[in-house]
A protein has these predicted regions:
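Domain-terminus/edge residues, biased toward the C-terminal soluble/receptor-binding domains
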Residues: 3-176
Length: 176
């Protein structure tokens, strides 16, 4: 399904960047047994447009028609678009371009919390201190519609006060 292709694409990009970079190659040459090497062009039309696309895959099935999973990384912000059911290669390219452009134009990536930076004070019960700084071990971002950006409210949820002792890297809160 389209959702499965999206999940696999995210996994490939995040967990295997060393393989993912191959999807951006516009052509590659491979040796064949008993013949001259073959140079083959990448069939992803978005690689040849001025979008900054760097993958992912094209496809065609009689039932699904033409499909395209495409991705761009613009200033550290990655968008993935997956579509199928297009009647032609041209429609596949045009609609995928429109979808990625829509995402870039109408959405922003907002930083919620920075890794290893305190983001909230948590009340502590029976501790040497009355509160402790809460940290996250990784950067946390949220993609949000630009028109709703000012309405974004981050809520720190915890059952508190948290009983001491609190160990380093202990989960004591959730960001919502």
């Amino acid at each position: 399904t389209v959702r499965d292709i999206l999940k696999m694409s995210r996994y490939l990009i995040k967990e295997h960047p060393e393989f993912y970079k191959m999807f951006a190659e516009k052509e590659f040459t491979w040796d064949r047994t008993g013949g001259d090497p073959i140079t083959q062009g990448n069939r992803n039309p978005l690689l040849y447009k001025n979008l900054g696309a760097d993958g992912i895959k094209t496809g065609y099935l009689a039932v699904e028609k033409y499909s395209l999973a495409s991705s761009i990384d613009r200033n550290g912000r990655r968008l993935i678009a997956v579509g199928s059911g297009f009647n032609s290669k041209n429609a596949r390219s045009k609609e995928s371009t429109k979808l990625l452009t829509y995402g870039l134009t109408n959405y922003d990536l907002v930083e919620i919390a920075k890794a290893n930076q305190p983001f909230h004070k948590i009340d502590v019960w029976l501790g040497k201190e009355n509160s402790v700084d809460a940290y996250t071990n990784e950067d946390i971002y949220k993609t949000i519609k630009k028109a709703k950006k000012k309405l974004l409210k981050v809520v720190v949820k915890y059952d508190g006060p948290v009983e001491a002792p609190i160990n380093k890297d202990q989960k004591i809160a959730t960001l919502r």
